[in-house]
């Protein structure tokens, strides 16, 4: 019997086909687009500062431009370039969102919902990305995508333990948050969210507070209740910068080790615990590789000589 396709699987297939047509960005393109986004974000921050100084009154474009030292035309040009750059960076990396989302399937959420949450996380990553740091955007964005998805899973686990009428209201609030985020290109404020839902800001705040009661990290989630919530949320990297630095360092170390012969690489990995954190003696390595202790020493010496010559590739990590 032929397998019946569901509407959801059709939507996913169509979505994947569409995003697959968007070309990936080169590192040089990421730098150019990233700088445009950062210029636009600084103008946005300036606007928020002016707004708070004026008692939440929205500054006019003329006031905004004057505070930025720009003409109205220059301000609008910066806005156009910034929003266009942000859109390009998001669209070129949607395949990464799908890749991360697939790792969290069977966690009480559909793939499309996971993709949507991951995309919102990536939008935040685009806004925070500093292209002058030298790393690729995809490495940096991975942290933001994963954080958004795991938080969404935690929220879902939390809301299914609330009364149904509160859960329904929270679902509406979440849906409107997504819509406004896509329309505005940023996270909606509480008053904007309340107005769109025909609620008062106090009511929206109250519903959101109800969804924030503590959850045990031992809580089991997933279709088969086979994963603890803490397993999804725990990470050794507390910031996207730390995650990116570690990922970049691993990649550069792997590239460095690729300059060694297979046997040299094995010796270094075992001698310094690169595989499992357990260092081994020369004799133990010799037994493992079925070569003499002296041959192990020779391979180690040759490998270290090669690595010292190429250490400039990881010098920045050693300095930091």
From Swiss-Prot:
Keywords: Cytoplasm, DNA-binding, Sigma factor, Transcription, Transcription regulation. Residues 168-243 are annotated as: Sigma-70 factor domain-3. It is found in: Cytoplasm. GO terms for molecular function: DNA binding; sigma factor activity. Its main location: cytoplasm. InterPro entries: RNA_pol_sigma-70_dom, RNA_pol_sigma70, RNA_pol_sigma70_r1_2, RNA_pol_sigma70_r2, RNA_pol_sigma70_r3, RNA_pol_sigma70_r4, RNA_pol_sigma_r2, RNA_pol_sigma_r3/r4-like. Residues 89-159 are annotated as: Sigma-70 factor domain-2. Residues 256-310 are annotated as: Sigma-70 factor domain-4. Sigma factors are initiation factors that promote the attachment of RNA polymerase to specific initiation sites and are then released. Belongs to the sigma-70 factor family. This is RNA polymerase sigma factor SigA3.
